[in-house]
Amino acid sequence: MRTLVAVLAGALVSSAPPAPAVAKEKGADKVPAVLNFKMKGLDGKEVDLSRYQGKVVLIVNVASQCGYTPQYKGLQALHDKFAKDGLVILGVPSNDFGKQEPGSNEEIAAFCEKNYGVKFDMLSKVPVKGDDKVPLYEYLTSKETDPRFAGPIKWNFTKFLTVAC
């Protein structure tokens, strides 16, 4: 697991430090704050991020019509190589940057499968910046979470790496 974290940390352009642990509720197992969110998958079903507890989680906002879109290939390669060691990649489609993700969730899923064979987890398309950004991205970009990484993300394929133990 340490090798996995070192390889990923060195390979990523931007990453976040591990999130502090907080209790879900009194007496419950501790779950890192970054996993205290529920979102929807591309299929519309609820995804409770706490299911990734104990994993290395790489959260990436993605878009299918961006100059960085070929990063899907590298993300899939990381998934193929390290998923068995506890790596989870969460793709989070967003249309916030240059309207480069105009498709529906179904179109995004088809694009990712056809062009990159994406098998890692993909969440539904959501806002990741501005006043209407989803709570997960509110947390990831919050000054209270880590002042070094606070503020709006700059573009598609911004990465947050956390050890969710």
What positions do the PLM features span?
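Conserved helix-turn-beta segment immediately C-terminal to the redox Cys motif
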Residues: K55-V56, S64-Q65, T69-P93, E113-Y116
